[in-house]
């Protein structure tokens, strides 16, 4: 029997507001524990919540960017549960009347475009953070009350790879809107995944498991891959899939049982009595719509049609707003479009991955990268020298030409000096001369390599090719 995988994702995104969802306390990351709180966050008796209008604006902006319908009337509800990092013993959320509904995004997997539906986007407040160790627990309520949006996909995702592509695209869109930085390492983007299997051709969904502790997109994919295999083996062996919550164990790549999954009835939702329903008229909607900036698909189209980049390059460059903004900044400084694209996707990305940092953690600027690329373009700096200059530029900033000079890496363009390297290479490799004369193209490349090696990569490659051909024709 063959099974079809059915996946739905619930993504929580922290909004980048200055204050919290229902209180004036600061909502910034990284403050001293329990310093960003006030009487509303701590659930003192008699205090009342006040809705953060900026958070509503940004929830609407995100909804519109995700092609959603904005509800004219929505309301807040109480989701009741007890946990130490939830002082009120309930969370203010939206249950049956969310701010946004019926959206979609288009993803690309294996060269195919697929539309993934989005059921809803609703607003809620975040809980605090509990840390458990050595038999005791610590609670930090700085995060308590931080504005969240929860984005719930339709069960349209059919593989872990599609789930990964969906998350990449969703993060990209939200980052471009400016409502969140979507940093998983800081908790400003979190994902829970629901997965079930059903026999091919069956309309009815199977029993789902919810996966938690998915701290990166890679872990989302790996957790779903393991769970897909686990459920398939269970069903093929005649077993039963239980509705349960499981956590992904990063150390062994497996999912482990946390608890039997609760349903919405267990939370005893009821309308929040301290907050009136939210009414959004057309004027408010239009005002928010005008604030939506250029989104990744629009930039991708521009890069292909205006800049002439391949679709793959355009896709990679627009995945994150910081990379796309950096690319546009460098091009605006006069850097060649394709060279800039190649460097950002190649040398820059390799450096970032190797050091496990973001572009904004470096000393790179569009200006200094453009300066280096223009030196490569006009022949002042070879690609080999650029690879030696770039780490210094990324770590300390400055001017690429000055770094090149300080390191003694100035490209050799003096013909007399280059001719010495050329003739030395020819004298030491007579067989290569014969191979060249017999039409073997690799011989030329070998000789160029010998010259570049002898000059420690500082020979001007264009001049080397010109002089080498000239000298070969004489022999």
From Swiss-Prot:
Allows the formation of correctly charged Asn-tRNA(Asn) or Gln-tRNA(Gln) through the transamidation of misacylated Asp-tRNA(Asn) or Glu-tRNA(Gln) in organisms which lack either or both of asparaginyl-tRNA or glutaminyl-tRNA synthetases. The reaction takes place in the presence of glutamine and ATP through an activated phospho-Asp-tRNA(Asn) or phospho-Glu-tRNA(Gln). This is Aspartyl/glutamyl-tRNA(Asn/Gln) amidotransferase subunit B. Heterotrimer of A, B and C subunits. The keyword Amino-acid biosynthesis does not apply. The keyword Ligase applies. Its EC number is 6.3.5.-. Keywords: ATP-binding, Ligase, Nucleotide-binding, Protein biosynthesis.
């Amino acid at each position: 029997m063959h099974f079809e995988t059915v996946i739905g994702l619930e993504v929580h995104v922290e909004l980048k507001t200055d204050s919290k969802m229902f209180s004036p306390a600061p909502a910034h990351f990284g403050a001293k524990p329990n310093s960003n709180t006030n009487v509303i966050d701590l659930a003192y008796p008699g205090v009342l919540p006040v809705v953060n209008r900026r958070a509503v604006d940004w929830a609407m902006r995100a909804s519109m960017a995700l092609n959603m319908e904005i509800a004219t009337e929505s309301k807040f509800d109480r989701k009741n549960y007890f946990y130490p990092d939830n002082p009120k013993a309930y969370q203010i959320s939206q249950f049956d009347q969310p701010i946004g509904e019926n959206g979609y995004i288009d993803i690309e997997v294996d060269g195919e475009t697929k539309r993934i539906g989005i059921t809803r986007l609703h607003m809620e407040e975040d809980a605090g953070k509990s840390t458990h160790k050595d038999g005791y627990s610590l609670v930090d309520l700085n995060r308590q009350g931080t504005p969240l949006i929860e984005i719930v996909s339709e069960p349209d995702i059919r593989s872990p790879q599609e789930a990964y592509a969906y998350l990449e695209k969703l993060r990209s869109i939200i980052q471009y809107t400016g409502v969140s930085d979507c940093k998983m390492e800081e908790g400003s983007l979190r994902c829970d995944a629901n997965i079930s299997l059903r026999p091919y051709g069956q309309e009815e969904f199977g029993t789902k498991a919810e996966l938690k502790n998915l701290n990166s997109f890679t872990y989302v994919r790996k957790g779903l891959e393991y769970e897909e295999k686990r459920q398939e083996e269970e069903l093929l062996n005649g077993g039963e899939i239980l509705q349960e919550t499981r956590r992904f164990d990063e150390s062994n790549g497996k999912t482990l049982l946390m608890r039997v999954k609760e349903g919405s009835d267990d939370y005893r939702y009821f309308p929040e009595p301290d907050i009136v329903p939210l009414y959004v008229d057309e004027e408010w909607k239009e005002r928010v719509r005008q604030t939506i900036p250029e989104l990744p698909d629009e930039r991708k189209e521009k890069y292909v049609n205006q800049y002439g980049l391949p679709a793959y390059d355009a896709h990679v460059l627009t995945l994150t707003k910081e990379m796309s903004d950096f690319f546009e900044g460098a091009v605006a400084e006069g850097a060649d479009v394709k060279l800039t694209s190649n460097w950002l996707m190649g040398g820059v990305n390799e450096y970032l991955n190797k050091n496990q940092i973001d572009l904004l953690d470096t000393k790179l600027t569009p200006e200094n990268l453009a300066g280096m690329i223009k030196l490569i373009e006009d022949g002042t700096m070879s690609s080999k020298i650029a690879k030696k200059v770039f780490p210094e530029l990324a770590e300390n900033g400055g001017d690429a030409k000055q770094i090149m000079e300080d390191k003694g890496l100035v490209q050799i363009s003096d013909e007399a000096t280059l001719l010495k390297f050329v003739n030395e290479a020819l004298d030491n490799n007579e067989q290569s001369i014969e191979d060249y004369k017999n039409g073997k193209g690799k011989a030329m490349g070998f000789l160029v390599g010998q010259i570049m090696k002898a000059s420690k990569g500082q020979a001007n490659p264009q001049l080397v090719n010109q002089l080498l051909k000239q000298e070969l024709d004489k022999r």
